[in-house]
């Protein structure tokens, strides 16, 4: 594995070492290369689907807002990649090839709604990246300033570009809403997937044990098959040794 090779040959760290420093280094390398892979994947797909400019605008909007507004993250690499494809390529492709446009009055209402949304929910911290109370007001002000700047920009550019900017604002707004947390993180899909796998296994076990005796039940403490298959990467606890 590339990360293990880097730890051993470049960072001069033992990959079997369970100390905090090694685990944190491995975690951040995993995040870095996962992000790099996603970026290359999005770039290639945007070129293939002819959405390079739209994808770039959405990317700039989210990069501009996310550091101060925060927001939910997908819990698995595969879900993150799927959401990235939808957000950066699929929907921009639809916007580019659609002739439908919002009337100006609806755009103004949407802009006002976005300002209220960011005022109310930004910054949105997570368990991995919590917002410190001392930073709350500063980040909220920065979020509102950046949202207002993007809204002003959308008023002085071509309609197609303005639509993409507003779309990026809407996406970032959805990422900080409490009601979208389970959807974006993938908890809904994980729960649904585990239920399907459990039902399938129970049916197969029931067929095998049919006529033999009492129908066996799955152990409630059995490993999380679905979570392991998805390959979720957990952030190590803060136990770095000085």
UniProtKB/Swiss-Prot annotation:
The chain crosses the membrane at residues 29-49, 52-72, 78-95, 100-120, 160-180. It holds the Pfam family AgrB. The keyword rRNA processing does not apply. It is found in: Cell membrane. Keywords: Cell membrane, Hydrolase, Membrane, Protease, Quorum sensing, Transmembrane, Transmembrane helix, Virulence. Its main location: membrane. GO terms for cellular component: plasma membrane. InterPro entries: AgrB (IPR006741). GO terms for molecular function: peptidase activity. It is a multi-pass membrane protein. One of its GO terms (biological process) is quorum sensing. May be involved in the proteolytic processing of a quorum sensing system signal molecule precursor required for the regulation of the virulence genes for gelatinase (gelE) and a serine protease (sprE). Belongs to the AgrB family. HAMAP family: AgrB. This is Protein FsrB. It comes from Enterococcus faecalis (strain ATCC 700802 / V583). The gene is fsrB.
């Amino acid at each position: 594995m590339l990360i293990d090779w880097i730890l051993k040959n470049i960072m001069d760290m033992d990959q079997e070492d369970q100390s905090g420093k090694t685990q944190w280094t491995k975690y951040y390398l995993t995040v870095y290369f996962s992000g790099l892979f996603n970026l290359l994947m999005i770039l290639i797909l945007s070129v293939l689907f002819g959405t390079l400019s739209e994808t770039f605008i959405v990317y700039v909007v989210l990069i501009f807002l996310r550091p101060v507004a925060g927001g939910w993250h997908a819990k698995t690499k595969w879900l993150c990649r799927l959401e990235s494809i939808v957000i950066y390529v699929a929907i921009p492709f639809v916007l580019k090839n659609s002739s439908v446009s919002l009337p100006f009055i609806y755009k103004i209402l949407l802009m006002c709604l976005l300002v209220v949304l960011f005022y109310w929910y930004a910054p949105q911290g997570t368990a991995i990246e919590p917002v410190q109370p001392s930073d709350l007001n500063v980040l909220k002000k920065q979020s509102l300033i950046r949202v207002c700047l993007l809204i002003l920009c959308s008023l002085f550019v071509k309609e197609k570009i303005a639509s993409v900017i507003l779309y990026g604002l809407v996406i970032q707004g959805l990422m900080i809403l409490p009601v979208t947390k389970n959807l974006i993180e993938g908890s809904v899909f994980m729960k649904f997937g585990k239920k399907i796998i459990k039902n399938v296994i129970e049916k197969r076990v029931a067929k095998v044990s049919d006529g033999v005796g009492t129908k066996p039940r799955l152990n409630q403490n059995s490993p999380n098959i679905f979570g392991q298959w998805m390959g979720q990467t957990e952030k190590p606890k803060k136990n770095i040794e000085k």
